[in-house]
Each structure stands twice: as structure tokens, then as C-alpha cells.
């Protein structure tokens, strides 16, 4: 929940994938143009290309997939020598348009195409934190909405906001997420009110009653 218990119901989550791209060129003194291949130039073009190409248009409940670079590194203490390699780290939050395997193929194709034009080689490492998932609104989800409306008066919005969640480990099982407000989530002294707990308990009780009767 966001501002009050039951104002939102999550019916999916975006996936998260981290990546490291390392570009290998040829080291050399900057005064002797043509004797080196600058991996920094290639990396800059890779970054520009990845940021300029839309990954998708989003879905009804999920925004377009988004890639952000989070770190760039060149292991070079000299200011007038072109380095042998340069690297960058990125994170992608991707919607249900992709599985991580298909997204990896798309990103690798873009990266390698740019590197090839710059006569550089690359190494790309990926780490998937979670796949995107989505449950099509069904009678159970609408039943939960009615329960929330009855208990709280909220007309719960269906969405897929936020980061990854532990429900990503449930595989292809249909699911929804409904819980307490997240206004103090991950903070020191994370807490909730007793009144919110009572509301949520009543919601859960009514959901179980409606589902099993």
C-alpha cells in the first residue's frame, strides 16, 4: 500500500538485471595517433547508443524498460596514455515484454555492433536479480478489490510499481501483493500503526472467507 492500506494492489513487478561491459582496445601514447585503439571512445559510444535506443513502449501496467549506467571505470593513472581497457556497470529494470535471456541478446547485439565499428573487443557479464512477472486481472483479483473497498473504502489501483519483491521466487504461479503502507520501509525504526494492522487483518480474513466459500 502507498498512502493508506489497500489503496494499491500489485499484480506484477519489473525484472532487474545488472550488467558489466568491458571494452578492450590497444594501449598507446596519446601523441602517436594511429598506434592505439581507444577503448574509452568505444565505451562512450556504447553508453550513448544504449541510452538512445528505446527498449520497448511499456505495457498496460508497466512502464517502458529502462537502463541506467551506475559506474564507469578506467584503470589508468597516466593522463597521456590511452588505456588497454575501460568498463561500465549498468542496471536494467525491464517489464514483462522480456525474459532476461531475450534482453541479454538484445543488449549484447547493440554493444557488440558498436564495438566492432571501433575495432574493439568486449566482455559482457550479466547478473539477473529477478524476472519480470505479471498476473492478468482475474475474478480472484477483482474479488480482492471488492474486499478492500468494503473494509477501507479504497478503490484499489492495480499496478506493478516498485522494485523487485520476494514473490518473484514463485515462478509462474498467479499472484498479487497487498500489504501495509511502505512509508517507513527499510528505514531505521521501520514501523506501522496498530490501526493499519487491524485493517489488513480484516482484509485478509475476508479474502480467505470469500475464496474458500
Segment roles from a protein language model:
Residues 1-52, 189-199:
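Fold-level recognition of mixed alpha/beta catalytic cores in primary-metabolism enzymes, strongest
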Residues 10-15, 79-84, 168-172:
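Short glycine/proline-enriched loop/turn "hinge" motifs that connect secondary-structure elements
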Residues 11, 30-73, 80-81, 96-123:
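Acidic-enriched catalytic cores of C-N bond-cleaving enzymes acting on peptides and small amides
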Residues 18-22, 87-91, 123-125:
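Beta-strand secondary-structure signal
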Residues 21, 90, 144, 169-170:
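Structural element of the ATP-grasp superfamily
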Residues 23, 81-86, 181:
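Short, flexible turn/loop "capping" segments at secondary-structure junctions
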Residues 66-75, 91, 95, 122-138, ...:
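A short beta-alpha structural unit
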Residues 147, 151-212:
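Zn-dependent metallopeptidase/amidohydrolase metal-coordination segment
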Amino acid at each position: 500500500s502507498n498512502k493508506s492500506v489497500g489503496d494499491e494492489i500489485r499484480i506484477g513487478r519489473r525484472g532487474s538485471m545488472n550488467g558489466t561491459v568491458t571494452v578492450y582496445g590497444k594501449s598507446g601514447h596519446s601523441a602517436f595517433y594511429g598506434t592505439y585503439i581507444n577503448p574509452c571512445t568505444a565505451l562512450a559510444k556504447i553508453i550513448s547508443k544504449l541510452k538512445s535506443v528505446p527498449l520497448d513502449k511499456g505495457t498496460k501496467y508497466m512502464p517502458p524498460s529502462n537502463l541506467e549506467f551506475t559506474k564507469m571505470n578506467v584503470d589508468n593513472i597516466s593522463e597521456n596514455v590511452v588505456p588497454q581497457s575501460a568498463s561500465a556497470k549498468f542496471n536494467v529494470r525491464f517489464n514483462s515484454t522480456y525474459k532476461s535471456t531475450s534482453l541479454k541478446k538484445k543488449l549484447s547485439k547493440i554493444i557488440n555492433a558498436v564495438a566492432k565499428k571501433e575495432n574493439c573487443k568486449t566482455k559482457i557479464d550479466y547478473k539477473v536479480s529477478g524476472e519480470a512477472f505479471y498476473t492478468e486481472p482475474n475474478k480472484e483479483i477483482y474479488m480482492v478489490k471488492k474486499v478492500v473497498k468494503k473494509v477501507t473504502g479504497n478503490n484499489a489501483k492495480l499496478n506493478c510499481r516498485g522494485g523487485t519483491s520476494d514473490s518473484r521466487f514463485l515462478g509462474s504461479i498467479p499472484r498479487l501483493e497487498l500489504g501495509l503502507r511502505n512509508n517507513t520501509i527499510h528505514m531505521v525504526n521501520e514501523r506501522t500503526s496498530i490501526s493499519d494492522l487491524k485493517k489488513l487483518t480484516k482484509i485478509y480474513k475476508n479474502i480467505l472467507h470469500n475464496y474458500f466459500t
